[in-house]
C-alpha cells in the first residue's frame, strides 16, 4: 500500500494506492487517521486512487474511522472514487453514511 498525504483547505487529503486495484487492508489508514486526530486534524478526505473493489474488512475499518472522526467533531469523506468502487459503495449504502465527492475541488471549504 502506498499512501500520499497533503493538506488542502480544511482537509487532510489521504491518497491510498494498492498495486492490485483493490482495497483490502486499511490498518495503515486507520493508524494514520488516529495520528491526525491526536494532532487535532479532524477533517479527512480519502481517495482510493484507481481501486475498483473494496473488501468487507476494509469497509468495516472505513466505517470505524468515520465514527472516530465524527466523535471528534470532524468529517471523513471519500473523494474521486473509481466508477466500480463508487457502484460498490452505493450498493452497500456507504454513500448514505460517508459523503462522496467527485473531486478535491468539490470539498466544502468550511466544516459541515
Give the residues covered by each predicted segment.
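Short acidic, glycine/proline-enriched helix-loop-strand junctions
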Residues: 6-9, 54-75, 96
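Residues at secondary-structure transition points
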Residues: 20-27, 53, 76, 95
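STAS-typified acidic loop motif
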Residues: 2-31, 48
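Amphipathic, Lys/Arg-enriched alpha-helical "gate/interface" segment within cytosolic domains
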Residues: 66-109
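Short secondary-structure boundary/capping segments
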Residues: 3-6, 36, 68, 90
Amino acid at each position: 500500500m502506498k499512501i500520499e498525504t497533503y493538506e488542502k483547505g480544511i482537509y487532510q487529503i489521504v491518497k491510498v494506492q494498492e498495486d492490485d486495484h483493490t482495497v483490502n487492508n486499511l490498518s495503515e489508514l486507520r493508524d494514520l487517521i488516529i495520528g491526525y486526530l491526536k494532532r487535532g486534524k479532524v477533517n479527512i478526505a480519502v481517495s482510493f486512487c484507481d481501486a475498483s473493489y473494496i473488501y468487507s474488512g476494509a469497509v468495516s475499518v472505513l466505517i470505524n474511522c468515520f465514527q472516530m472522526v465524527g466523535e471528534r467533531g470532524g468529517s471523513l469523506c471519500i473523494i474521486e472514487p473509481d466508477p466500480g468502487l463508487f457502484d460498490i459503495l452505493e450498493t452497500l449504502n456507504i454513500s448514505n453514511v460517508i459523503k462522496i465527492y467527485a473531486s478535491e475541488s468539490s470539498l466544502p471549504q468550511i466544516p459541515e
